[in-house]
From Swiss-Prot:
Function of the protein: The SMN complex catalyzes the assembly of small nuclear ribonucleoproteins (snRNPs), the building blocks of the spliceosome, and thereby plays an important role in the splicing of cellular pre-mRNAs. Most spliceosomal snRNPs contain a common set of Sm proteins SNRPB, SNRPD1, SNRPD2, SNRPD3, SNRPE, SNRPF and SNRPG that assemble in a heptameric protein ring on the Sm site of the small nuclear RNA to form the core snRNP (Sm core).
Bias type Low complexity, positions: 156-166, 206-215
Consequence when changing W267A: Impairs homooligomerization
Annotated region described as Interacts with GEMIN2, given as residue ranges: 26-51
Biased composition regions of type Basic residues, renumbered to the chain: 68-82
GO aspect biological process, one term: spliceosomal snRNP assembly
Protein name, as recorded: Survival motor neuron protein
Effect of mutating Y272C: In SMA1; abolishes SMN1 binding to RPP20/POP7 and severely impairs binding to SNRPB, GEMIN8 and homooligomerization
Location of the region described as P2 (binding site for SNRPB) in the Swiss-Prot/TrEMBL record: 240-267
């Protein structure tokens, strides 16, 4: 049997509509290899055929509603279970101490049973220390031990939060020169954070020597006027005296009142140190004069 020399060698001829990609069709290597036109056409063709079949009723459209599962009937309680439930409800009586969940916040509080309605299986409890009265189901009442355990858990959580806050405050207030002063009171007078006077250079003269009228640094300056305090930033925690902080780096977070308060405080502190320096120089001058007279 002779085979024809032409053609594709006896293979089944390919249909042009079903060919999505053919390699070596004479295109150059620079052609766009990401051309997905054929894929888009095939997708549109598949979608169109599906819509056509759906329109003719060959495919049933699935509804978006979930299938309803048959409800499970509650298991019938036998007589022994009913007796146990009745016994658990009968154990509470008026005046018993218990723990109840307050409906406002969902927390457990100690309470005392004021009245009981066994027909409705409810009771009225009075919260210890608060005096609030609330109706509760007898099955929802808890023993006082549950309340104690809940308080222990709440106290542990509060202690953990307080320790976390104190740790954050100590890390923020720690400086290279003062690392041991971690615990500081919440409020302090104004002069507690004034900067210390500069150290006295050279040997310091003791009290009682002739010609000495300026002994040591001057007393701390009085608090600034109230109108300065109203413009100043919130007070800093007490502790060793520190230098007033510079103004914030970001100018957007500083309004006119804060900037004015910072400027007035800087003038006030500058005057304090200027007075100390002038007094120190006057002390040195009078000391030299007294030594020359002797």
């Amino acid at each position: 049997m002779a085979m024809s020399s032409g053609g594709s060698g006896g293979g089944v001829p390919e249909q042009e509509d079903s060919v999505l990609f053919r390699r070596g069709t004479g295109q150059s290597d620079d052609s766009d290899i990401w051309d997905d036109t054929a894929l888009i056409k095939a997708y549109d063709k598949a979608v169109a055929s599906f819509k056509h079949a759906l329109k003719n009723g060959d495919i049933c459209e699935t509804s978006g509603k979930p299938k309803t599962t048959p409800k499970r009937k509650p298991a019938k309680k036998n007589k022994s279970q009913k007796k146990n439930t009745a016994a658990s409800l009968q154990q509470w009586k008026v005046g018993d101490k218990c723990s109840a969940i307050w409906s406002e916040d969902g927390c457990i509080y100690p309470a005392t049973i004021a009245s009981i309605d066994f027909k409705r299986e409810t009771c009225v409890v009075v919260y210890t220390g608060y005096g609030n009265r609330e109706e509760q189901n007898l099955s929802d009442l808890l023993s006082p031990i549950c309340e104690v355990a809940n308080n222990i858990e709440q106290n542990a959580q509060e202690n953990e939060n307080e320790s976390q806050v104190s740790t954050d405050e100590s890390e923020n207030s720690r400086s290279p020169g003062n690392k041991s002063d971690n615990i500081k009171p919440k409020s302090a007078p104004w002069n507690s954070f004034l900067p210390p006077p500069p150290p006295m250079p050279g040997p310091r003269l003791g009290p009682g020597k002739p010609g000495l009228k300026f002994n040591g640094p001057p007393p701390p300056p009085p608090p600034p006027p109230p109108h300065l305090l109203s413009c100043w930033l919130p007070p800093f925690p007490s502790g060793p005296p520190i230098i007033p902080p510079p103004p914030p780096i970001c100018p957007d977070s500083l309004d006119d009142a804060d900037a004015l308060g910072s400027m007035l405080i800087s003038w006030y502190m500058s005057g304090y140190h200027t007075g100390y320096y002038m007094g120190f120089r006057q002390n040195q001058k009078e000391g030299r004069c007294s030594h020359s007279l002797n």
